[in-house]
Amino acid sequence: DEECWSLYDVRYVVTQREHASRVYHSILRRSKAAADVVRRGFLTCLPEKETRLYALIKKLYDEGGDFLRNTADPVYYPVAKALRHMSGELEKLRGFVRFSDYSGVLGAEIEPKNRVLPLLRRHFCDRYANESFFIYDRTHKELLVYTKNHSRLLTVDSLHLALPGEEEVQFRRLWKRFYETIAIKERYNPRCQNTFMPKRYRCTMTEFLPDDYEARQQGVNLPAASEASPVPGAPAGISAPATPPRSGPSAPGSDL
């Protein structure tokens, strides 16, 4: 290990789970809302959150939990603001997580500012109860794994995704074609798009990634998939990627 230089003494505090459990339950007895604020507050990206949460807990012991009703309270306000930010990120990630098929296992990556995987865990485990999947948090090096009604959160330094199969690449192209053609050109509004789909989420979204981005990360060249071939099992009404859609009959009563 490299030697670290500091003007201050460094003190390592070993976690005492029994002691921590007693403190948490004492907070819970005073205010269930405060216990939830503390638990979720540790998952936020609030700078110096430990110090701010300590001040909040101290005020809870000294004055009770009534101050939590006032979001303008100088002790509670920064924590409440961080919790709102995390809630907004959670709401977006419930819709922005993009899974790919890796040999029968669904996999996705995210880059959140807050440590959201513990809070997303139940949502995705319920939603994909019959699947096996994983979600990797690049920011916090955390991996959520689910299979056969069991889920685990693991600490993983890095994750190298397997190369996608031809069918997966074709489905990605279909999804991109849908994304590109569903928009109304005359109503294109990048400012509105950036509001509802912020750019920082797009680095892990299929719509904005090359089909073979895993291979590019590993320096592997994949053979080009045939753009004219349809995806196995895809509805006949969906054109193959890069194939212009054919004209169809007009709506009943139309002269077009």
Segments from the language model and where they lie:
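Extended, well-folded catalytic/binding cores that form a central cleft or groove in large enzyme
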Residues: 1-249, 253-256
